[in-house]
C-alpha cells in the first residue's frame, strides 16, 4: 500500500495564549483517534502551534483504507433449497440482496447447522475522501468554552479563521473547512513576511515557515529558544533570570519569532516588596525578572518581542516607558499602606461580606483567631500569637496593594505585620494561612502558621457545611476539597496529633447556631474521605484505605499510621488467609447478630483441642499486641496478630461453630467475637481479601 504525508493547518487571528497548547494537543489527539478508527495507518503524527496557527503533520499516511472481507449470512441450507435441489424464494431473495445469483453463494458450517453466505471484498475508501470529515470532527471536538462567528459566516471557532491548508502529498485536498476553500498556502510573520508562502509538501512546512516566513511553528523549539535567550541575556547583569514555567509557556504562545531584550528600571523601586514588582511585571507585561546569586531582585527585566527589530533599543525604551508607571503605582500603594497598621484595618473588614449566612470577613477573622488559639494550645504553640495572627489574617484585604493585586493577599500581610513590629511568627502566619494553595505546595513552616491555616480552613468547611451548601459534583465554589486536603496534609506531614472531631466541635461552637443537622459527623466523614485520593496517588490499594476508614479514627496522624501499617501487613504471606478468616468470622457474627466485644470465652465449655489452642493463642497475642496498639505502633501490632494464622486455620478445619448445644455455640461465638475485636483495634482486615 502506498503512503503519503498529510498536513492540515488552521490559520487564524491570534489564538488565546493560555489555551494554545491544550488546543494543539487536543486537535492532534482528535485526528489521531479518528485516523485509527478509520483504520488509516500512519508512521508518525506531529502537532505545531503558534499564535496564528494550529497544524498537524501526519507522516506515512496510507492512501486508502485496507480492503475488507465482508461475509453476509443468509438462510439455513435446509430452507434454501427444495427437495429437488432448486433454490427457494428465500435463497433467491438473499442472492438478489447481495447482487449475485444462488450458484455464487457459499456454505458455512456452524455448531447450529449449515447456512448460506455471500463473501465479497469491500475496497477501502481513499484517504483524501475521509480526511475532511476527520479534520472537521476534530475541530468540532476541541475544548473551546466559547466559540465565535465572524463576518457573514455561520461557522464557529475560537478566533476568526482566514486560511486552511489540506495537503496530501503534493496535492491539495478539494474541500471546505470552516467555510474556507482548502489550499496549500500559508502566511508568515505578520510584519516580517505577511505575503503568502506556498507549501510544496507537508514535510517542507516547518522549514518553509522558519526560513521564509519568520515563524517558528514548533512550540517546544520556540519555548526552548526563549529559555536560552532569556538565560543568556540575564548573564549580562551578572545575575540570573527567574524563569517561571507558566510564564514561559504563555510567552511561547504569544510569539512566533521570539527575540529576548533586557530593560532596566530605577533602583528606588527595589524598596517595594519584590513580590509586588514581580506580580506587575509577570501578570501585566509578561516580563521575566532577574536576581543576584543570593536571590535578591535586580533592577532589570527581560521582555520577549515578537519581532526582530532593526532598532532594539527603541523597543527596550518603549517597554521601560510602559513598566515605569506600573512600578510607580506599586510604590505608591506600598507607601500609602504603611501609614496604617494592620490592626487599625480590622474595622475596615466589617462591611465586607464573607458569606451572607456566615457574616462578614471581620466575623470570620475573629472566629479564626479564637479557633487558632485553641489549636495552638493543643500543638504546643503560642495561643496569644495564634489569636493575634488569626485576627489580623484578613486585614491586608483592605490595603491598596492587595486591592490592586489580589494575588498578593497574605504576602503583603506578612510585610505589613513585620513593619508593624508584630512577632515574627505572627507576620509569617499572614502568608502561611493560605498554604498549601494547591496539590504538592509547601506547608506552613511555623506552628503559628499551622494553627492559623488550620483554623481558617476549618472555619470555612464547617460554616459552609453548616448552612447546607457542601460541594456537589464538580461544583465547589468555596474550595472545600482543597481546604480539607490542606488540613490533612498539615496534620499528617507536620505530625500534629489533633482530633478532627474536636476541632470541628470548636469551629461549630464559634459559628453559633447553624441549621445543618449532624454537622460534626458530616464534616469529619467528608474530610476523612479526602484521604481516598491521597492514598490512591501514593499507590496504596483502596481496600487498605477502606479497612481503616471502617474504624473511623478521627486523628489524621493516627489514620495515616494505621494505613501504612495495613499496607505493610498486606505484604505478609499470612495476610490473605487472615483476611479471609476475618471475612468468615464477620459473616458468621453478622448472621447470628452477635455483638463484637473483647469479652472472653469460657474455657470450661471448650470441647475441642483446636478451640482451646485458639483461645490460648488469642490471649497471648492480644497481650503482646496491646502495648504496640497503645503506642500506635500498628505495624508491630499486626505482625504479632499475623502469628495467629495457623491456629485460626486449624480452628475452622476442626471445629463446628454452629452446634446444637446453645451454650457451646454461644461460647464459640464469643471466642470469634473476641478474635474479630482484636483485629478491629487496628483495621477491618476482612476488607483486604484477595487484594494483595
UniProtKB/Swiss-Prot annotation:
- Write down the NCBIfam families for this protein, in alphabetical order: glyS
* Keyword flag Cell inner membrane: no
EC number(s) for this protein? Answer: 6.1.1.14
Q: What keywords does the record list, in alphabetical order?
A: Aminoacyl-tRNA synthetase, ATP-binding, Cytoplasm, Ligase, Nucleotide-binding, Protein biosynthesis
- Fetch the Pfam families from UniProt: DALR_1, tRNA_synt_2f
Compartment(s) of residence: Cytoplasm
Output one GO BP term. Answer: glycyl-tRNA aminoacylation
Q: What is its main location?
A: cytoplasm
**Name this polypeptide is given:** Glycine--tRNA ligase beta subunit
The protein's GO terms of the molecular function aspect are: arginine-tRNA ligase activity; ATP binding; glycine-tRNA ligase activity
Q: Which reaction does it catalyse?
A: tRNA(Gly) + glycine + ATP = glycyl-tRNA(Gly) + AMP + diphosphate
Subunit record text: Tetramer of two alpha and two beta subunits.
InterPro entries named among the record's database cross-references: DALR_anticod-bd, Gly-tRNA-synth_bsu, Gly-tRNA-synth_heterodimer
Q: Which GO terms describe its cellular component?
A: cytosol
* Family stated for the protein in its record: Belongs to the class-II aminoacyl-tRNA synthetase family.
Question: Is Cytoplasm a UniProt keyword of this protein?
Answer: yes
Q: What class of enzyme is it?
A: ligase
Amino acid at each position: 500500500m502506498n503512503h503519503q504525508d498529510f498536513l492540515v493547518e488552521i490559520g487564524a487571528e491570534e489564538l488565546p495564549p493560555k489555551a494554545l497548547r491544550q488546543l494543539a494537543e487536543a486537535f492532534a489527539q482528535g485526528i489521531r483517534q479518528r485516523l485509527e478508527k478509520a483504520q488509516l495507518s500512519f508512521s508518525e503524527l506531529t502537532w505545531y502551534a503558534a499564535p496564528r496557527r494550529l497544524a498537524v503533520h501526519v507522516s506515512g499516511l496510507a492512501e486508502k483504507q485496507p480492503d475488507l472481507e465482508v461475509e453476509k449470512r443468509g438462510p439455513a441450507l435446509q430452507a434454501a433449497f427444495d427437495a429437488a435441489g432448486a433454490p427457494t424464494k428465500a435463497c433467491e431473495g438473499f442472492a438478489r440482496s447481495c447482487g449475485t445469483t444462488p450458484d455464487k453463494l457459499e456454505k458455512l458450517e456452524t455448531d447450529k447447522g449449515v447456512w448460506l453466505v455471500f463473501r465479497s471484498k469491500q475496497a477501502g475508501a481513499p484517504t483524501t475522501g475521509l480526511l475532511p470529515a476527520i479534520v472537521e470532527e476534530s475541530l468540532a471536538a476541541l475544548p473551546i468554552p466559547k466559540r465565535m462567528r465572524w463576518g457573514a459566516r455561520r461557522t464557529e471557532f475560537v478566533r476568526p479563521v482566514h486560511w486552511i491548508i489540506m495537503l496530501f502529498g503534493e496535492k491539495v485536498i478539494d474541500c471546505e473547512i470552516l467555510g474556507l476553500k482548502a489550499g496549500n498556502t500559508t502566511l508568515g510573520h505578520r510584519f516580517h513576511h505577511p505575503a503568502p508562502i506556498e507549501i510544496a509538501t507537508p514535510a517542507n512546512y516547518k522549514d518553509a515557515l522558519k526560513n521564509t516566513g519568520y515563524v517558528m511553528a514548533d512550540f517546544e523549539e520556540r519555548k526552548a529558544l526563549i529559555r536560552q535567550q532569556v538565560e543568556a541575556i540575564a548573564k549580562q547583569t551578572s545575575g540570573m533570570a527567574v524563569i517561571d514555567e507558566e510564564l514561559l509557556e504563555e510567552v511561547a504562545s504569544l510569539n512566533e519569532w521570539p527575540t529576548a531584550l533586557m530593560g532596566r528600571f530605577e533602583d528606588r523601586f527595589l524598596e517595594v516588596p519584590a513580590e509586588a514588582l514581580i506580580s506587575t511585571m509577570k501578570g501585566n507585561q509578561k516580563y521575566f525578572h532577574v536576581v543576584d546569586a543570593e536571590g535578591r531582585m535586580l533592577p532589570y527585566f527581560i521582555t520577549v518581542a515578537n519581532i526582530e527589530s532593526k532598532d532594539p533599543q527603541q523597543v527596550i525604551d518603549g517597554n521601560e516607558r510602559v513598566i515605569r508607571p506600573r512600578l510607580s503605582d506599586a510604590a505608591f500603594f506600598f507607601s500609602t499602606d504603611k501609614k496604617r497598621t494592620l490592626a487599625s484595618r480590622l474595622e475596615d473588614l466589617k462591611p465586607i461580606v464573607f458569606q451572607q449566612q456566615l457574616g462578614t470577613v471581620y466575623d470570620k477573622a475573629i472566629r479564626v483567631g479564637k479557633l487558632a488559639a485553641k489549636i495552638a494550645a493543643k500543638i504546643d504553640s503560642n495561643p496569644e500569637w495564634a489569636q493575634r495572627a488569626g485576627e489580623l489574617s484578613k486585614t491586608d484585604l483592605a490595603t491598596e496593594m492587595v486591592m490592586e493585586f489580589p494575588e498578593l493577599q497574605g504576602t503583603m500581610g506578612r510585610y505589613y505585620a513585620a513593619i508593624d513590629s508584630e512577632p515574627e511568627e505572627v507576620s509569617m502566619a499572614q502568608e502561611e494561612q493560605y498554604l498549601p494553595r494547591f496539590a504538592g505546595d509547601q506547608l506552613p513552616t511555623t506552628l503559628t502558621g499551622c494553627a492559623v491555616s488550620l483554623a481558617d480552613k476549618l472555619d470555612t468547611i464547617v460554616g459552609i457545611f453548616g448552612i447546607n451548601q457542601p460541594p456537589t459534583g464538580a461544583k465547589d465554589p468555596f474550595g472545600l476539597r482543597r481546604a480539607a486536603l490542606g488540613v490533612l496534609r498539615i496534620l499528617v506531614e507536620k505530625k500534629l496529633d489533633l482530633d478532627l472531631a474536636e476541632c470541628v466541635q470548636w469551629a461549630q461552637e464559634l459559628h453559633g447556631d447553624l441549621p445543618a443537622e449532624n454537622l460534626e459527623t458530616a464534616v469529619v466523614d467528608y474530610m476523612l474521605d479526602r484521604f481516598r485520593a491521597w492514598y490512591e496517588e501514593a499507590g496504596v490499594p483502596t481496600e487498605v484505605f477502606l479497612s481503616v476508614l471502617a474504624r473511623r479514627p478521627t486523628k489524621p496522624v493516627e489514620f495515616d499510621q494505621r494505613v501504612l501499617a495495613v499496607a505493610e501487613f498486606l505484604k505478609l504471606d499470612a495476610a490473605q488467609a487472615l483476611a479471609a478468616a476475618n471475612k468468615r468470622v464477620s459473616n458468621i457474627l453478622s448472621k447470628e447478630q452477635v455483638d463484637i466485644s473483647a469479652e472472653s470465652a469460657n474455657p470450661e465449655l471448650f470441647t475441642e483441642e483446636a478451640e482451646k489452642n485458639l483461645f490460648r493463642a488469642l490471649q497471648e497475642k492480644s497481650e503482646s499486641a496491646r502495648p504496640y496498639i497503645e503506642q500506635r505502633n500498628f505495624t508491630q501490632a499486626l505482625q504479632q496478630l499475623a502469628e495467629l494464622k495457623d491456629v485460626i486455620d486449624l480452628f475452622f478445619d476442626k471445629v463446628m461453630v454452629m452446634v446444637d448445644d446453645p451454650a457451646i455455640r454461644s461460647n464459640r461465638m464469643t471466642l470469634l467475637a473476641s478474635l474479630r475485636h482484636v483485629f478491629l483495634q487496628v483495621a477491618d482486615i476482612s476488607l483486604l481479601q484477595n487484594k494483595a
